[in-house]
C-alpha cells in the first residue's frame, strides 16, 4: 500500500504563496491590515532555548500532521475505531483539534513580484559608453563568475520604481518581507544563472542522502520484518507499520532548499543614517542605517541557519527547521504515531550553516552628548559581511533592529529582574491574610531580560570614502560605490588610506578631478596647504606645517628580514597656557579620518593600547581595542601628555616606534597593529616654560619617549606689541563675523581630497638628496656629539629617520615621486626649528679659574728669561692701572674671599671651544711644539682683534679665555700636561717638567671627530 505521508518534509510542503512562520522575535511588528485579523493564527517557535525540554506550544509542523490526521479519520474509519482505546490515538485526536489554516500573505507576494521585476528591468545609462546597462542582471553574472552569494541593492534605485512604494514597503517592514525578497532573488537567479543555485557540496550531499536512506530502510526491514504481518488488512500493529513507512518516506526526501545556495541581499545608500542613541523599539523590523565605531569583534563562527533533526524514537527526519536566534528544535515529531517531543539528534551533514560574527560598536566621538556615557550596540554579521569591520573602523551598517533574549542576564544567579508589586507600604500583620495562594504571585510577571541588537546586511567603512562625493550626488557615484563593494568582496581585501590612484580617481566626479588637477599644477601649493590647516588659529606656521606633514605621512617600508619601518610622524606640542595647543588637537580630530581624542590624565595603559576582556555570552576572552588601535591608519590626539603616569607612558613605547601592540594575557598572545600617528600636547612643569631649563627639564617625560617624537614645537607666550595687536584683531573678527573672518585658500573638502590623493604617492630619494641628507644629519649631530651641555637635545638616528619621513611628506605635498635636496632642506629647517629652538642655560665659570692666568704668567716669565725676552710674556707683564687698582681693592676686602661666578652665553662658549680645539688639533697634526695657556689665549685674541674696540674689552676677553680653557679641562675636552712630551721622554730634565704646562686634546673627547670633517671640507 502506498504511504499516506507526504513525500517531502512538512516545512517544505508549505504552498509557494504562503508566509513562512515568523519567529518569536519578529511576531510583534510588521503586521499590515490584511494580516492583522490572522495574528491569532500565527505559529510560534518554542520559547525555551534548551534542547530536550518538553513544550506544549504548537509547532511549525502541526499543519501537516493535522491535515494527515483529518484525511486518515475520513478515509480509514476502522483504523480509527481500533485506535480509540489506545493512548496514541487520544494524542492523535488532540492534534486534530488544533487545526489551523495557513495564511497567504498577499502583500508579501506582491512585493516579491515587484522585486523580481526590479532586478530584471532596472537599467542605468553608462557615462563611459553611453549605452543602457541592466545593473543587477550584470551583477548576477558577476556573482556567477566569482562565485559570490550577496547581491548589492542601491536603495535610491528602489525609490525610483513605482513612485517609491516598493522602497517604502521594504523599509517599513523589512523583516517581514525579507523571505519573499530572497525567494524572488532565487527565482531570478534560476532564470538567468541556474548554475549559481547549486553549491559545491550539493552533489556530495545528494549522494550522501541516498546512501543514508538505503541504510535506514535496511535497518527498518531488519527491525520490523519478523514481527509485522504482510497482510494489508491486518491491524495487529498499525502504529509500527505506519512508523516504518513514514521513516522510509521522510528519510529519502530531500528538499530543494536544503541543497540550494543561501543568497543574501545587501541594501545600501539609505537617505538617513541614524545614531545609536536614536534606536528605539518603534523601529524594530524596519530597514535603517546606523553609524558607529567598532570597538570589539568576535571570531567568525558557524551559525546554524536551517537545521535538520532526526527523531530518536522513530528515526524520522525533519528538514528546514528555522533557528530563531537560538537553538530551536521541532516541538513534536511529524509522525502521528510517535509521541516524541524532546529527543532529537541534529544532522550536521544535512543542516545548513552560515558564517557568523558579532561586532560591538560605540557611538562616534562627535555624537556623544556632553556628560553622557557612550552607548554601545551589538551588530550581527552573516555570510559575506563578516570580517569587513575591524576594531577602530568608523563604519556604517545597514540592516534591521531586532530584539533578542539577554543571555547574560538569564544565566546570572539570584533573583531574576522582573516587574513586581511594591509592597513596602503594606503592614506585615496583614500581609499573610491578603496574600492568597502563594503560587499566583508570579502570574503576569514580565521578564526584563531582553536587549536590542542589530542584524546587518551591509557594512562599509566611512573612513575609506573620505574625499568621495555624497551618497546622493549622482547615480554615477552610487554605481561606482556598488562596483567597489562588489570588487571589495571579490578580492577579499579591505581598502586602507593608501589605495591605488586609479581606484581613488574613479570615485571622484569630473569636476572634482579637474579641481584636483588645478591644485597639483599650483606652484605655491605647499604654502597654500599650510595656510588651509586650522585657519581659525592665528600664526604658528611651523606647527601647521608639522600637522600637514603628519596627515600626509611618510612611506611605510620593510626590511629584508621583515622588520617594518614606520612612516607615520609623531609630533609633540609644548608651550605655555592659552597658546592653542588643544585647539590644534580638536581640529585634527574633526578633520582627519579615524582620529581619536583622549586625555593623558584620564587614560590608562590598557585604555591606550588594548585590554583583554571576557565575552559575556560565550565566556571566551577577547581583545577590546584601545585608543591607539581605534586610531589605526589615523591620528591619536593625546592631550595633557605630561600628566600621564610614567608607567602608562612606557606602554606606548612599542606602539610609537614598532607600531604594534603585543599582548600576553589570559592565554592570549597576540601582536596587534597600531599604525597610528601621535599628536601630543603637553604643558611645562610649573605651568609656564622656563627658559633657563632644558626641554627635558620642562617636561615630565622620559628620554626614550622623547626620542620617539619626530618634531617638538615649543610655543612661548612672548609679549610683542605687533603680534598681540594682530592676534586680538583676529579673535575679535572671528567672534563678530564667524566664518566670514576666515578665508583659507582651500576648503576642508578640497584639502581632504588632496591629502587623500597625495598619500597615493611613494617618493624615493635621489643620489643628490642622499648626500645632502647625510651632510645635514652631521650638522645636527655635531652640536650634540658628547652631550656636554645639559641643555642640548640628544640627536639620535631616530632624528635622521625623522628627516627622511618629513622629506617624503613634503614630496607628497607637492605630488612628486622623487625627493630633491630642496625638500630635505625644508625638513632640516623644520626639524632644527622644532628641536634646537629651545633656549639653553648660560655656562657658569668660577673665579678660581683666574689662578690659571697667574700660573701661566709665572711659567711664561721663566720661559722669557730662558728665551732672552722673546715670547708672549711681554704683552701680559703690565695690565692697565685702573684694572690693577680694581683687583687690589677687591683682594683687600674681606668678603671677596668667596667664589664668584662668571657667566657666558652658551653660543659664545661653543664658539670659543670650537676655535681652541681646532687650533690645538692643528698643532698636534703638524707635530709642532705644544701650546701653553698663554699661547692659546694670545692666538685667540689675535683672531678676535677686529671685534675688540677698547683695552678694557681686550683684558675682559683675555680673562674669559683663560676661564674657558680651565672649563674645557674640567669637561675633559682638553688635558693638562706638565712639561712637553719631548721633555717627558728625557728623564734627566726633571726641572723643565714642573716649569711648563701645555694643553692637548683629551683622549676621550669626541668633539674633534665632528670638527675635523668640517676643516677638511
UniProtKB/Swiss-Prot annotation:
Acts as a component of the MCM2-7 complex (MCM complex) which is the putative replicative helicase essential for 'once per cell cycle' DNA replication initiation and elongation in eukaryotic cells. The active ATPase sites in the MCM2-7 ring are formed through the interaction surfaces of two neighboring subunits such that a critical structure of a conserved arginine finger motif is provided in trans relative to the ATP-binding site of the Walker A box of the adjacent subunit. The six ATPase active sites, however, are likely to contribute differentially to the complex helicase activity. The keyword Oxidoreductase does not apply. Residues 35-83, 224-257 have a biased composition (Polar residues). Pfam families: MCM, MCM6_C, MCM_lid, MCM_N, MCM_OB. Residues 525-732 form the MCM domain. GO terms for biological process: DNA replication; DNA replication initiation; DNA strand elongation involved in DNA replication; double-strand break repair via break-induced replication; mitotic DNA replication; pre-replicative complex assembly involved in nuclear cell cycle DNA replication; premeiotic DNA replication. This is DNA replication licensing factor MCM6. Residues 209-223 have a biased composition (Acidic residues). Residues 24-34 have a biased composition (Low complexity). The modification Phosphothreonine is found at residue 766. Component of the MCM2-7 complex. The complex forms a toroidal hexameric ring with the proposed subunit order MCM2-MCM6-MCM4-MCM7-MCM3-MCM5; loaded onto DNA, forms a head-head double hexamer. Interacts with MCM10. Belongs to the MCM family. GO terms for cellular component: CMG complex; cytoplasm; DNA replication preinitiation complex; MCM complex; MCM core complex; nuclear pre-replicative complex; nuclear replication fork; nucleoplasm. It comes from Saccharomyces cerevisiae (strain ATCC 204508 / S288c) (Baker's yeast). It is an enzyme of class 3 (hydrolase). Present with 13400 molecules/cell in log phase SD medium. Early fractionation of eukaryotic MCM proteins yielded a variety of dimeric, trimeric and tetrameric complexes with unclear biological significance. Specifically a MCM467 subcomplex is shown to have in vitro helicase activity which is inhibited by the MCM2 subunit. The MCM2-7 hexamer is the proposed physiological active complex. One of its GO terms (molecular function) is ATP hydrolysis activity. Changing residue 581 to A: Loss of MCM2-7 complex helicase activity. A motif (Arginine finger) lies at residues 707-710.
Amino acid at each position: 500500500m502506498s504511504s499516506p505521508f507526504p513525500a517531502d518534509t512538512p516545512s517544505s510542503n508549505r504552498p509557494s504563496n504562503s508566509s513562512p512562520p515568523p519567529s518569536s522575535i519578529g511576531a510583534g511588528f510588521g503586521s499590515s491590515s490584511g494580516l492583522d485579523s490572522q495574528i491569532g493564527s500565527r505559529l510560534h517557535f518554542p520559547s525555551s532555548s534548551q534542547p530536550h525540554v518538553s513544550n506544549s506550544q504548537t509547532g511549525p509542523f502541526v499543519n501537516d500532521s493535522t491535515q494527515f490526521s483529518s484525511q486518515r479519520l475520513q478515509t480509514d474509519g476502522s483504523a480509527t475505531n481500533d485506535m480509540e482505546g489506545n493512548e496514541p490515538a487520544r494524542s492523535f485526536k488532540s492534534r486534530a483539534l488544533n487545526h489551523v489554516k495557513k495564511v497567504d500573505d498577499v502583500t508579501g507576494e506582491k512585493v516579491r513580484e515587484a522585486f523580481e521585476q526590479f532586478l530584471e528591468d532596472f537599467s542605468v545609462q553608462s557615462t563611459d559608453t553611453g549605452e543602457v546597462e541592466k545593473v543587477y542582471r550584470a551583477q548576477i553574472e558577476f556573482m556567477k563568475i566569482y562565485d559570490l552569494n550577496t547581491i548589492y541593492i542601491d536603495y535610491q534605485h528602489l525609490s525610483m520604481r513605482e513612485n517609491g512604494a516598493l522602497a517604502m514597503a521594504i523599509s517599513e517592514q523589512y523583516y517581514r518581507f525579507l523571505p519573499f525578497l530572497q525567494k524572488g532573488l532565487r527565482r531570478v537567479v534560476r532564470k538567468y544563472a541556474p548554475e549559481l543555485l547549486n553549491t559545491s557540496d550539493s552533489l556530495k550531499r545528494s549522494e550522501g542522502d541516498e546512501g543514508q536512506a538505503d541504510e535506514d530502510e535496511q535497518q527498518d526491514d531488519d527491525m520490523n520484518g519478523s514481527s509485522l504481518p504482510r497482510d494489508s488488512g491486518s491491524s495487529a500493529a498499525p502504529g509500527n507499520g505506519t512508523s516504518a513507512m513514514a521513516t522510509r518516506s521522510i528519510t529519502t526526501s530531500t528538499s530543494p532548499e536544503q541543497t540550494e545556495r543561501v543568497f543574501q541581499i545587501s541594501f545600501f545608500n539609505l537617505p538617513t543614517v541614524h545614531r545609536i542613541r536614536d534606536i528605539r523599539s518603534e523601529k524594530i523590523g524596519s530597514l535603517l542605517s546606523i553609524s558607529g565605531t567598532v570597538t570589539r569583534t568576535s571570531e567568525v563562527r558557524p551559525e546554524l541557519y536551517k537545521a535538520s533533526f532526526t527523531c530518536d524514537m522513530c528515526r524520522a527526519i525533519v528538514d528546514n527547521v528555522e533557528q530563531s536566534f537560538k537553538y530551536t528544535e521541532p516541538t513534536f515529531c511529524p509522525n502521528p504515531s510517535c509521541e516524541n517531543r524532546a529527543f532529537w539528534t541534529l544532522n550536521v551533514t544535512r543542516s545548513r550553516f552560515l558564517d557568523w560574527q558579532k561586532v560591538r560598536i560605540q557611538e562616534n566621538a562627535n555624537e556623544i552628548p556632553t556628560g553622557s556615557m557612550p552607548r554601545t550596540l551589538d551588530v550581527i554579521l552573516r555570510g559575506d559581511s563578516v570580517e569587513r569591520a575591524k576594531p577602530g573602523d568608523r563604519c556604517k551598517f545597514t540592516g534591521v533592529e531586532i530584539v533578542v533574549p539577554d543571555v547574560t542576564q538569564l544565566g546570572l544567579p539570584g533573583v531574576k529582574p522582573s516587574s513586581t508589586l511594591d509592597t513596602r507600604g503594606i503592614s506585615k500583620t496583614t500581609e499573610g491574610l491578603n496574600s492568597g495562594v502563594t503560587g499566583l504571585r508570579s502570574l503576569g510577571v514580565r521578564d526584563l531580560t531582553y536587549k536590542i541588537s542589530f542584524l546587518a546586511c551591509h557594512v562599509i567603512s566611512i573612513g575609506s570614502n573620505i574625499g568621495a562625493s555624497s551618497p546622493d550626488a549622482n547615480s554615477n557615484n552610487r554605481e561606482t560605490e556598488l562596483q567597489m563593494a562588489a570588487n571589495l568582496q571579490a578580492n577579499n581585501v579591505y581598502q586602507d588610506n593608501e589605495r591605488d590612484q586609479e581606484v581613488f580617481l574613479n570615485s571622484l566626479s569630473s569636476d572634482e578631478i579637474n579641481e584636483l588637477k588645478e591644485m597639483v599644477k599650483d606652484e605655491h601649493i605647499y604654502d597654500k596647504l599650510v595656510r588651509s590647516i586650522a585657519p581659525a588659529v592665528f600664526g604658528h606656521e611651523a606647527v601647521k606645517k608639522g600637522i600637514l606633514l603628519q596627515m600626509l605621512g611618510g612611506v611605510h617600508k620593510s626590511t629584508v628580514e621583515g622588520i617594518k619601518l614606520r612612516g607615520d610622524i609623531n609630533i609633540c606640542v609644548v608651550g605655555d597656557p592659552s597658546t592653542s595647543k588643544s585647539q590644534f588637537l580638536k581640529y585634527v580630530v574633526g578633520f582627519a579620518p579615524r582620529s581619536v581624542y583622549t586625555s593623558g590624565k584620564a587614560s590608562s595603559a590598557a585604555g591606550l593600547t588594548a585590554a583583554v576582556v571576557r565575552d559575556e555570552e560565550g565566556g571566551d576572552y577577547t581583545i577590546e581595542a584601545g585608543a591607539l588601535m581605534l586610531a589605526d591608519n589615523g591620528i591619536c590626539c593625546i592631550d595633557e601628555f605630561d600628566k600621564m603616569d610614567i608607567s602608562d607612558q612606557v606602554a606606548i613605547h612599542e606602539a610609537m616606534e614598532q607600531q604594534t601592540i603585543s599582548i600576553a594575557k589570559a592565554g592570549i598572545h597576540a601582536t596587534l597593529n597600531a599604525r597610528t600617528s601621535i599628536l601630543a600636547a603637553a604643558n611645562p612643569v610649573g605651568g609656564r616654560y622656563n627658559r633657563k631649563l632644558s626641554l627635558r627639564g620642562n617636561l615630565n617625560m622620559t628620554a626614550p619617549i622623547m626620542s620617539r617624537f619626530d618634531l617638538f614645537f615649543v610655543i612661548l607666550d612672548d609679549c610683542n606689541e605687533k603680534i598681540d595687536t594682530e592676534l586680538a584683531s583676529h579673535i575679535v573678527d572671528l567672534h563678530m563675523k564667524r566664518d566670514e573672518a576666515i578665508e583659507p585658500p582651500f576648503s576642508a573638502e578640497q584639502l581632504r581630497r588632496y591629502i587623500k590623493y597625495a598619500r597615493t604617492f611613494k617618493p624615493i630619494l635621489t643620489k643628490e638628496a642622499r648626500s645632502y641628507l647625510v651632510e645635514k644629519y652631521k650638522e645636527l649631530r655635531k652640536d650634540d656629539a658628547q652631550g656636554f651641555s645639559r641643555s642640548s637635545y640628544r640627536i639620535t638616528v631616530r632624528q635622521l629617520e625623522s628627516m627622511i619621513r618629513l622629506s617624503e611628506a613634503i614630496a607628497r605635498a607637492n605630488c612628486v615621486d622623487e625627493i630633491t635636496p630642496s625638500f630635505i632642506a625644508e625638513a632640516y629647517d623644520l626639524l632644527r626649528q622644532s628641536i634646537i629652538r629651545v633656549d639653553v642655560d648660560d655656562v657658569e665659570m668660577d673665579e678660581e679659574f683666574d689662578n690659571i692666568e697667574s700660573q701661566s704668567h709665572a711659567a711664561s716669565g721663566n720661559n722669557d728669561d730662558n728665551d732672552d725676552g722673546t715670547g708672549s710674556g711681554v704683552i701680559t707683564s703690565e695690565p692697565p692701572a685702573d684694572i690693577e687698582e680694581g683687583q687690589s681693592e677687591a683682594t683687600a676686602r674681606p668678603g671677596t674671599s668667596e667664589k664668584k661666578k662668571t657667566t657666558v652665553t652658551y653660543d659664545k662658549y661653543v664658539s670659543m671651544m670650537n676655535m681652541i680645539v681646532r687650533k690645538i688639533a692643528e698643532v698636534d697634526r703638524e707635530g709642532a711644539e705644544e701650546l701653553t695657556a698663554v699661547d692659546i689665549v694670545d692666538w685667540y685674541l689675535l683672531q678676535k682683534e677686529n671685534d675688540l674696540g677698547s683695552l678694557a674689552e681686550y683684558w675682559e676677553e683675555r680673562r674669559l679665555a683663560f676661564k674657558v680653557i680651565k672649563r674645557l679641562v674640567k669637561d675633559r675636552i682638553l688635558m693638562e700636561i706638565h712639561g712637553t712630551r719631548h721633555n717627558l721622554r728625557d728623564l734627566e730634565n726633571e726641572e723643565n717638567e714642573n716649569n711648563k704646562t701645555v694643553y692637548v686634546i683629551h683622549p676621550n673627547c669626541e668633539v674633534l671627530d665632528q670638527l675635523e670633517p668640517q676643516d677638511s671640507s
